[in-house]
Regions:
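Surface-exposed amphipathic alpha-helices with a cationic face
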Residues: 51, 72-76, 122-130, 148, ...
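Catalytic beta/alpha-barrel core
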Residues: 38, 58-64, 86-88, 108-117, ...
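N-terminal active-site wall of soluble small-molecule enzyme domains
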Residues: 66-105, 116-125, 140-146, 163-167
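Conserved N-terminal beta1-alpha1 strand-loop-helix module at the mouth
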Residues: 1-82, 88-93
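Catalytic cores of alpha/beta
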Residues: 98, 143-147, 186-198
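Conserved small/polar residues in nucleotide/adenosyl-binding loops
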Residues: 225-232
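Short beta-strand/loop segments at the ligand-binding rim of alpha/beta enzyme cores
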Residues: 78-87, 127-136, 173-182
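Glycine-rich phosphate-binding active-site loops on the catalytic face of alpha/beta enzymes
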Residues: 108-113, 157-163, 198-216
Length: 233
């Protein structure tokens, strides 16, 4: 009965054009974080994309040392929950704890630490903030049990081509642990990741440049058609 429910959709003429996550992600169970059910998570720090995508949440991590001003900018623009990166690679120790506090104060729904983060730092962060700590897993050799003992609440599996296998191994040992995972580029890879046990899927959107390229190509095609029609007349 529930599968056949009609879902009304409201949009406006100016904002009807947006990026949409793959529909296959809706088959995931989702993770309920602070009362919000999250299935699709867009992987971006681009506020233009964040404001024009139908994902349930954002995972805002980037390959530089985290800066509070960046978190503040994303949080002020986002209209969906944000998981924000607080370091763990280049950034370690007390700074990770301080960045986590700042992220919570700014309204983040969770903080993400990278794989190199020590269990001691994970424990300090968990003891300091009230929002969940998401620990990134990049290999099947990760000591999941020690991460859980340190206080990790969610695992973010990002193991490239091995992601599905890593998710499956974690799920075998821990049936109830929340798992976010990269879904890959195809419908088949997304469904395989969900089948392996992922509760939520991260999706990498096209860049602004890629979206613009398609739009401009369409404009050029229309312009060329009009020009040819004018020449014929």
């Amino acid at each position: 009965m529930a599968e056949n429910l009609y879902i009304p959709e409201i949009s406006g003429p100016l904002r009807s054009f947006m990026l949409k996550v793959p529909e296959e992600i809706q088959q995931a169970s989702g993770i309920r974080v602070m009362g919000k059910l999250i299935k699709s998570i867009v992987f971006t720090t681009d506020i233009c994309i964040i404001r024009n995508v139908n994902a349930d949440a954002v995972i805002a991590v980037y390959p530089f040392t985290p800066q509070p001003i960046i978190t503040q900018a994303i949080m002020s623009a986002a209209d969906i929950p944000v998981f924000t990166g607080v370091g763990g690679g280049l950034t370690q120790g007390k700074r990770v704890v301080n960045l986590s506090m700042h992220a919570e104060f700014q309204g983040a729904i969770g903080v993400v630490v990278n794989a190199p983060t020590s269990n001691d730092v994970v424990r300090q962060v968990c003891d300091t903030i009230d929002i969940p700590v998401v620990v990134t897993v990049i290999s099947e050799h990760e000591d999941i049990e020690s991460r859980l003992e340190a206080g990790a609440k969610i695992f973010n599996v990002s193991a490239a081509g091995k992601t599905t296998n890593v998710v499956r191994e974690i799920r075998k040992r821990h049936p109830d642990i929340p798992i976010i995972a990269t879904g890959g580029p195809t419908s088949e890879s997304i469904l395989a990741t969900i089948e392996a046990g992922a509760n939520a899927i991260t999706w990498t959107p096209p860049t602004n440049g890629e979206v613009f390229r398609d739009i401009m190509n369409a404009y050029r095609a229309v312009s060329y058609t009009h020009l040819r029609a004018h020449e014929t007349d």
